[in-house]
């Protein structure tokens, strides 16, 4: 089995090293095409106005000055001579749950893999801040992902569907199981910090404030709070079929077929 790895935290990210160790429990034919720099929050963006610079780091390891989407395309179309059987995107430093998935470059790696016709999974590890420092328990995903992926690798997924895997912030022996979940909902409370440069001109940082949400049972955010691994099937079709008829009637078209 040929496996292509990517991420959005960059080629030197600890989560990518963890993902390679996980992938090598499944195959010896593991390839990496990952961003040269941190691409967090760029979602499914595609570089069309700038050239892509590809750098070979070592055997089957490549860094690309581009987005996670670019990395998957380059991996399949340029780097690898044969299409991969599986794409793993991650392991992200931080969960990708609820509305996070719309911002996530990690999710985008799996989206692009799915668009390219390759079975794709996104993996993310929840963390906690302690005394202002991010503490990521990578040992959780490393302990539990190999067996979980082994169970999921051969299931029949519809075209346009991929799996989003999130691992809880706890010790490996505190994981209370695995749950198949739906996407939850969080209020992000995005904040704008205004600052001034050395010449007095303003510049801005976006940051997340305290997040809030309704942690309904059966959702990804609820599962993580229960120290459970969340497995969420996501699909590329964003159509809201429940309102098609309503929109058709408003336009005087009658009920949509």
Curated annotation (Swiss-Prot):
Subcellular location: Cytoplasm
Keywords: Cytoplasm, Hydrolase, Metal-binding, Nucleotide-binding
MF annotations from Gene Ontology: 3'-nucleotidase activity; 5'-nucleotidase activity; exopolyphosphatase activity; metal ion binding; nucleotide binding
Cofactor remark from the record: Binds 1 divalent metal cation per subunit.
Record Pfam families: SurE (PF01975)
Cofactor: a divalent metal cation
Metal-binding keyword on record: yes
Sequence positions that bind a divalent metal cation: 8-9, 40, 92
NCBIfam families in the record: PRK00346.1-4 (NF001490), surE (TIGR00087)
Function: Nucleotidase that shows phosphatase activity on nucleoside 5'-monophosphates.
Protein name stated in the entry: 5'-nucleotidase SurE
């Amino acid at each position: 089995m040929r496996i292509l790895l990517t991420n959005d935290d960059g080629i030197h990210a600890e989560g990518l090293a963890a993902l390679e160790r996980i992938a090598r429990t499944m195959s010896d034919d593991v390839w990496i095409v990952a961003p040269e720099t941190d691409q967090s929050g760029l979602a499914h963006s595609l570089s069309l106005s700038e050239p892509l610079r590809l750098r070979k780091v070592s055997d089957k390891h490549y860094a690309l000055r581009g987005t996670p989407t670019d990395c998957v395309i380059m991996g399949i179309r340029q780097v690898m001579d044969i299409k991969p059987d599986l794409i793993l995107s991650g392991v992200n430093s931080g969960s990708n749950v609820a509305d996070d998935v719309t911002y996530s470059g990690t999710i985008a790696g799996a989206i692009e893999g799915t668009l390219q016709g390759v079975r794709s999974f996104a993996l993310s590890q929840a963390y906690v801040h302690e005394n202002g420092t991010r503490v990521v328990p990578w040992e959780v995903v490393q302990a539990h992902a190999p067996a979980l992926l082994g169970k999921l690798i051969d299931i029949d997924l519809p075209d346009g569907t991929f799996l989003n895997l999130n691992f809880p912030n706890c010790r490996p022996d505190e994981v209370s199981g695995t749950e198949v979940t739906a996407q939850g909902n969080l209020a992000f409370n995005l904040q704008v910090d205004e600052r001034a440069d050395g010449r007095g001109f303003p510049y801005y940082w976006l940051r997340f404030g305290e997040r809030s949400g309704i942690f309904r049972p059966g959702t990804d955010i609820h599962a993580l709070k229960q120290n459970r691994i969340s497995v969420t099937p996501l699909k590329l079709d964003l159509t809201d079929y429940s309102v098609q008829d309503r929109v058709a009637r408003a336009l005087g078209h009658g009920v949509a077929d």
